[in-house]
Each structure stands twice: as structure tokens, then as C-alpha cells.
């Protein structure tokens, strides 16, 4: 089934203003947020040894790379706004595309943005001037929640005003944080006084261990790698997408994997396993030991810059999904509006900010938020990666600027790993996973009610060829 927009469709489209450099920076910038600084403790506490932590980082990196390679093939074939939404619609039809859009819009992206905002407040709380963040502001509302909501709206405003300027800000912040990561790692390795290569073979008692421990650590690692798919949602705004998207997806994940391994090695060179497992902020503790308050301050600034880049990019890309669905009449048409002056999907961006703010008010906790986001995202990661097989069978002669290396093994391994993660998520965090599943299932009646409520001649099938 082809899903090209019908020829009679004449409405304005988003302009292609993003360069290949912007696309690469979006991938790197969105992935490297707070994860590398906040999850090493969770990983070490789960697996209990430096070697197992490396095994988790490598496994998570390879899975993300396999997913990026699978997405690259489809994105280069179909460089449309909405990314995964468009791929799922073309492969499986409007119901699956609606369920993805519903889940993405109502839970996955708002939970992801709320997690980023909560992580930023966690970082700012390390500065004495922000010590008040852990106190109540009004009633049960914490200052950290209030400022996280304010930051969400500030970033949303930036993204509404200009896609090009937002991308340039995000690109600048991305390369700045890459430079700071290299400097931080270099300072650790330069510390002859505190560094110890024996730390890499150390372990500690008390870790959960076993398969359960490995999976808990892997979920944390995958959250740290999360975001590599977001650039596909802006495929319709990327210049020369057939070349730019594969380079951005595969190159971005590779760069991030190298930086994560470097950072993890730097921390472990300075801190033994037991110290990492006990530390709320292992990178900060390592630099505090090496360079005192100056080092700890450098890490905090680096984390703030890092999360800022993720914040801008994640908010920028996320709103393209409901925008694309609205343009195909699968979502309320108001979400498909383009701002007459700024040429951005401003209504979708506003909705995204509202839902993210509500999640921050309702939950506000870092751990619960990333558990909520991981489940729903990985279900649709698996379905989207599977479109590689669908299109290979259905359209064997289609032009493919990039073909996934290692087909069919690479996409199959990614899909299998995603399914294992989904099962484990239900076992380890049943409440959050059940909530995610219920949101998806609620989309089925919503889809049919929405289609029935529209006037004859205004159905999605009248605008999109099946």
C-alpha cells in the first residue's frame, strides 16, 4: 500500500531548512543528554562490576546502531515529515499509524520531554543557588517541578519562532557539550594521583546481578542512547535527505557510542565500582576528587549544556508526528496548522508543551518518568524497524539510497531485542508498563470514533492513497 498524499492536496508544507550538519547535531544532541551523567550509578548498582557495565554499554550501543541502520534505509526511501508515522502508515495502514501518533503524542514524547526537564532540575540542584529546588513552592508543588515546566515552555517558544534558528542553537550546544565531555574525560585520565587502572577489574557486593540486573542496566543504557530516531521525524525538513539522513542516523549513534565509552572509562579510572554504585552523580564525584570544586562545577555546567541541547532538539522534532497525522486527516486538523509568519507547526508544539507540563505535575520523578517513556517507545521502534522487511517484499525494485548492512540479521536482532525489553518492562515495572499499554489500547476506539465523527469526504482515506 502506498501512502503518498493524494495529488489534490495543496496545503502548505514545512520548508527544508535543515542541513546535513544540523541533522547530525540533532541526533548527537538529542541522545547525549543527562543519561551519561545520571545512569552510571543505576547500571553499576544493577550489574555490580566494571566489566559488566561495559558489556551493557556495548550492547545498548549496538542495539541502537542496528535500529539506526534500519531506520536509515526507510527514511532515505521516504523522507517525509513525521518519520515513523509515515513509515508505519505506508507499511501497516492508518490504524497502526494512528496508534503510534496517539501514543507518541499523549505519552511517549511528553514523558521524554518531562524526563529531560526533571533531569535538568536534578543537575541545577547541585548549585548552591538552586538549593531551593527540593523545597515546596505552592502546596505540594516543588520548585523543581515549577522550573521544569517553565523551561519546557521557554524551549517551546524558541522552537515556534524559528526551526532554522532552533537548529543552529541546538548545533552550537551539541558541539560545545562534545568538547566539554572530551575535556572532562581528559582531566580524569590526566590524574595520576587518583587514577587507578585496577578499578576496571573491580566489583562490589550488593548488586542485583543476573539476567534481571543486566536488563535493568540495559534499560538505563537504552534511555541514555534514546533519541537517535527523532531526526527521522524531521525528514521532510532536511536538505538532500537521501544522503543526509543515513549519515546523521548511523554517524550520530557511532559518535555517541564512542563518547559514552570514553566518559565511562574516565569515571571508572578515578572511582572504584562501589563508589560509582553509591554516588548519585558519579561524574561529579570523579571531577570533585580530581580538581576539587572547580571540577565539580565544570561537570555541572557540562550537564546543563548537554541537557539544554537535548531539550531543544527533542521538543523540535517531537511535534512533527501529530502535525503529519493531522495533515493526513488522522488527527484533529488544528494540529496541522503552520504558523503564517514562522513556518513552524506551532499548535502541535503547544500541545506537546501542555502534555509535558501535566506529566511533570502528576509524576515529576526521574525514575518513574523514564520507565513510562521507555515502554511505549520501544514497542513502536520494533514495528518501525520491521517495515524494512515489509518494503523489501512489497517494493523490491524501489530506489534505496541506503541499504541496511547485514540485512536481514541486523533488523531482526533489533526487533527481537525490543520485544525482550517489552516483556521485561512488564515484569520489572508492571504499573508503568500497564499504563503505557492502556494508553495504546485506548487509541483503538478513539481512532474509530474520530473517523466516524468526520463528515463524508473528510476521512483519511480520501486524502491518503491506500
Listing of model-derived features with the role each one plays in the protein:
Residues 181-184, 322, 373-400, 417-420, ...:
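Hydrophobic alpha-helical segments of multi-pass membrane transport proteins
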Residues 42, 65-152, 157-160, 303-324, ...:
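Hydrophobic transmembrane alpha-helices that form the core helical bundles
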Residues 124, 143-194, 208, 249, ...:
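Membrane-interface loop-to-helix entry segments
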Residues 8-14, 50-54, 131-143, 175-301, ...:
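Helix-loop-helix junctions that connect adjacent transmembrane segments
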Residues 334-346, 381-432, 453, 465:
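C-terminal membrane-solvent junction of multi-pass transporters and transport-like membrane proteins
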Residues 1-41, 45-51, 58, 64-69, ...:
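Membrane-interface "cap" regions at the ends of multi-pass membrane proteins
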Residues 86-88, 93, 125-135, 204, ...:
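TM-loop-TM module centered on a large, flexible mid-protein loop between adjacent transmembrane helices
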Amino acid at each position: 500500500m502506498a501512502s503518498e498524499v493524494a495529488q489534490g492536496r495543496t496545503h502548505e508544507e514545512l520548508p527544508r531548512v535543515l542541513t546535513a550538519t544540523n541533522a547530525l547535531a540533532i541526533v548527537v544532541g538529542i541522545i547525549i543528554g543527562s543519561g551519561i551523567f545520571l545512569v552510571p550509578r543505576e547500571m553499576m548498582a544493577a550489574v555490580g562490576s566494571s566489566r559488566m557495565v561495559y558489556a551493557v554499554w556495548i550492547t545498548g550501543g549496538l542495539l541502537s546502531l542496528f535500529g539506526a541502520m534500519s531506520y536509515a534505509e526507510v527514511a532515505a526511501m521516504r523522507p517525509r515529515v513525521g518519520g515513523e508515522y509515515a513509515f508505519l502508515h505506508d507499511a501497516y495502514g492508518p490504524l497502526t499509524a494512528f496508534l503510534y501518533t496517539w501514543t507518541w503524542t499523549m505519552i511517549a514524547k511528553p514523558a521524554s520531554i518531562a524526563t529531560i526537564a526533571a533531569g535538568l532540575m536534578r543537575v541545577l540542584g547541585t548549585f548552591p543557588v538552586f538549593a531551593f529546588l527540593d523545597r515546596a513552592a505552592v502546596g505540594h508543588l516543588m520548585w523543581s517541578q515549577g522550573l521544569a515546566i517553565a523551561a519546557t515552555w521557554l524551549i517551546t517558544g524558541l522552537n515556534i519562532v524559528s526551526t532554522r534558528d532552533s537548529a543552529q542553537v541546538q548545533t552550537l550546544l551539541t558541539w560545545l557539550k562534545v568538547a566539554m565531555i572530551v575535556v572532562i574525560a581528559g582531566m580524569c585520565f590526566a590524574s595520576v594521583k587518583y587514577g587507578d587502572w585496577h578499578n576496571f577489574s573491580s566489583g562490589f557486593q550488593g548488586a542485583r546481578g543476573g539476567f534481571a540486573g543486566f536488563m535493568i542496566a540495559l534499560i538505563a543504557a537504552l534511555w541514555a542512547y534514546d533519541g537517535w530516531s527523532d531526526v527521522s521525524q524531521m525528514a521532510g525538513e532536511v536538505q538532500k535527505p537521501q544522503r543526509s539522513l543515513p549519515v546523521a542516523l548511523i554517524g550520530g549513534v557511532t559518535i555517541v557510542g564512542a563518547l559514552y565509552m570514553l566518559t565511562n572509562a574516565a569515571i571508572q579510572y578515578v572511582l572504584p565500582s562501589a563508589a560509582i554504585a553509591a554516588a548519585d552523580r558519579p561524574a561529579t564525584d570523579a571531577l570533585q576528587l580530581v580538581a576539587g570544586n572547580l571540577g565539580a562545577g565544570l561537570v555541572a555546567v557540562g550537564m546543563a549544556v548537554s541537557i539544554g541541547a537535548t531539550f531543544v532538539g527533542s521538543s523540535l522534532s517531537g511535534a512533527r508526528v501529530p502535525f503529519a497525522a493531522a495533515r493526513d486527516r488522522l488527527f484533529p486538523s488544528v494540529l496541522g496548522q503552520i504558523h503564517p509568519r514562522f513556518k513552524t507547526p506551532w499548535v502541535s508544539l503547544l500541545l506537546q508543551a501542555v502534555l509535558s507540563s501535566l506529566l511533570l505535575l502528576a509524576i515529576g520523578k526521574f525514575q518513574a518518568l523514564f520507565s513510562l517513556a521507555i515502554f511505549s517507545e520501544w514497542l513502536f521502534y520494533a514495528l518501525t524497524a520491521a517495515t524494512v522487511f515489509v518494503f523489501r517484499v512489497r517494493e523490491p525494485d524501489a530506489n534505496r539510497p541506503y541499504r541496511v548492512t547485514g540485512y536481514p540479521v541486523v533488523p531482526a536482532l533489533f526487533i527481537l531485542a525490543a520485544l525482550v525489553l517489552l516483556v521485561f518492562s512488564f515484569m520489572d515495572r508492571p504499573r508503568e508498563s500497564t499504563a503505557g499499554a492502556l494508553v495504546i489500547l485506548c487509541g483503538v476506539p478513539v481512532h474509530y470514533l474520530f473517523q466516524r465523527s468526520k463528515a463524508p469526504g473528510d476521512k483519511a482515506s480520501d486524502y491518503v492513497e491506500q
